[in-house]
Every structure is written in C-alpha cells, then in structure tokens.
Regions:
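Cyclic-dinucleotide signaling modules
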Residues: 1-67, 71
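EAL-family c-di-GMP phosphodiesterase catalytic domain
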Residues: 10, 24, 92-96, 109-110, ...
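Short glycine/serine/threonine/alanine-rich loop segments
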Residues: 10, 49, 82, 128, ...
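Heptad-repeat coiled-coil signal-transmission/dimerization helices
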Residues: 34, 172-175, 202-205, 209, ...
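Bacterial c-di-GMP phosphodiesterase EAL domain
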Residues: 57-184, 196-197, 210-211, 231
Length: 322
C-alpha cells in the first residue's frame, strides 16, 4: 500500500490502520463488536498508524478512560487549566538561545500535570485539538510581545498546527486576527505543520501555506522524514525550515542508518536554501555531530526541557565544540 498512485498527474499515497474484534470471543452482538473494533483501531493509530491491533478487554478500560479524559479536557478549556510551556531552541554555531517552541500542558486539579502523550491523542480524536491549537497560538503571540517589550532578543516563537486545524479554511483568518489583536510582528511567528498533514492534501496544503506566508510569518515542516513526501512536492512548498524528527536524532552518532538519513536531510535542505532544525538532542555528542554536519538549530533536553515562560534562562549557551 506504500506504493504511489498516479492520478491526473498527481502522486497520491494511501495507508491503513486496522482494528480487529472477533465474534463471538470478543462480543456477542454487532454493536459491541464494532465498538471493540473501534477501540482496537485507536490502539493501532496510537502505535504509529499503518498497522493493525487486536481487541483485548484491557482496551475497554482504556476506552472508558479516554471518555473521561475527553470530558475533563473539555472542562479544562473552559476552566483555564491548560498551560503553555516553552522549549528553548539554540543556534548550534553560536550555542545562543534564539527561539522557543510553544507546547501545551494540562494542569489537572486532581491529577497534577498530565503528560501530553496522555491527552493530545484524545484531543486529536475528538477534534478538540483545533481549539487547543488556536488557544496556544494566541497565548504564544501575547507572550512573545511581552518578551519583545522586555528587550528579550528572540528570533521566533514556533507554534504547532495540527492537521485538523491546518485543513480548515478559517486558519488564515484565525492567524491574521491573532496577529492583529496582539500586534506581534509576523516575522517573529513560525507555524509548524507535520509532513503527513501536508501530504494529506498536497494542493490544498500548498494554497493554505501560500496564504499564510503572505502574512509575513515563517513556515516549517515538522517531523520531516516520517512521511512519504516527494521531492517534487517539497520544492513547491513555501517553507523556510525542515525539522528532523527526534526518532532519527536518537541514534546519532552511532546508528549508521540514522546518520545516513540525517546527513541526506541536511544536504537536501541546504541545497534548497532551507534551515535545518534537529529535535530530541539529549547528549552533547549528538549536538556536536549535528554541528559538524552543518545543522543550523538544535532543540532537546540537553539544551532545556519545556518550561513556563518565567523559568527560561536567556543566558544559557552550552558550549558545543566541533
């Protein structure tokens, strides 16, 4: 199924996630069978998509938990329980902190800080992710304005845009309204969209990106290397940056496959005039290796974890030697 389909001069890709529930061992009626298969499908998608999962009784417990979390998450939006944390992004050449990525966190009144891996997939499944994205965008822009007023020298604040929100025509209006309301210079805002979101509707994505780019902001492809984008499509996108997925960075510098992929992505990016941003840097050896490959920017626990705006250390510049 990974093979491309050529339809009207466009290359299209399809994939499948499958949830399996068996009659009569898993259920005694069609309604329950479908419900259990849906739980298994959620597990398959959570495991990275493009695979299958079998139903187990444990999934029913997970399904009930998802319903509870989804209900709590709706309340969290209304009760202002969400928080925006910021993870520093460093210039690998100078080690200087030059930007931040805005990341949502949930401060639950009873459970404390809920891990994003626990509620983001549910937010995506229920459609709440678009509303969360919009809120994070507004908060990040206001915060960037405050930093600018305080004299903090930052080149950009990056905000993730989910595939659900990216596919909506009203995204342009949302972004332009937030920029107008906050007064933030559009050049200081970077929107990140995943490679898979762009490939889901390449023509629609291209039009959406050109509209957003016309506002004067920056665009980045997140998790690059995890999808099936063609170079022909990539060169048409009005993006300024490719972000290397942390899954490829984790194996550096010892994994030969990761080394080959990262080296190729960096070379490709530079040949197209794009910046390269590596995520998931947890060791100095990874930072040094990426610097030697001429990667531009780095982000990860070695530089700093996501944290509240008040806790960012603007002077931190860990030395990286070639």
């Amino acid at each position: 199924m990974k093979a491309a389909f050529d339809i009207e001069k466009h290359q299209l890709f399809i994939s499948a996630s499958v949830g399996i529930s068996v009659f009569p061992s898993d259920a005694l009626n069609a309604e329950q069978l479908l419900r259990n298969a849906d739980s298994a499908l959620f597990k398959a998608k959570n495991a990275g998509r493009e695979g299958y999962a079998l139903y187990t009784e444990e999934l029913t417990v997970h399904a009930l938990n998802r319903i509870e979390v989804a209900s709590d998450l709706r309340r969290a939006l209304e009760q202002h329980e969400l928080r925006v944390y910021y993870q520093p992004v460093h210039d690998l050449n100078t080690s200087r902190l030059i930007g931040v990525e805005a990341l949502v966190r949930w401060q639950h009144p009873l459970r404390g800080l809920v891990p994003p891996g626990e509620f983001i997939p549910i937010a995506e499944r229920t459609g709440l992710i678009a509303e969360i994205d919009a809120w994070v965008l507004e908060q990040a822009c206001w915060q960037m304005c405050q930093w600018q007023s305080a004299g903090v020298d930052l080149s950009f604040v990056a905000v993730n845009i989910s595939s659900r929100l990216f596919a909506r025509p009203e995204l342009y209006t949302l972004v332009s309204t937030v920029l107008a309301d906050t007064g933030l210079d559009p050049a200081l805002l970077e929107l990140e969209v995943t490679e898979s979101a762009v490939m889901d509707d390449s023509q629609g994505a291209l039009e959406q990106m050109h509209r957003l780019r016309a506002l004067g902001l920056r665009l980045a492809i997140d998790d690059f290397g995890t999808g099936f984008s063609s170079l022909l499509r990539l060169k048409r996108l009005p993006v300024q940056k490719l972000k290397i997925d942390q899954g490829f960075v984790a194996g550096l510098p010892g994994d030969n496959d990761d080394v080959a992929i990262v080296r190729a992505v960096i070379a490709l990016s530079h040949s197209m005039g794009l910046q390269v941003h590596a995520e998931g840097i947890e060791q100095i050896e990874q930072a040094q290796f990426l610097l030697n490959l001429n990667c531009n920017l780095g982000q990860g626990y070695w530089f700093g974890r996501p944290m509240p705006a008040s806790e960012l250390d603007w002077q931190r510049a860990p030395a990286i030697s070639r």
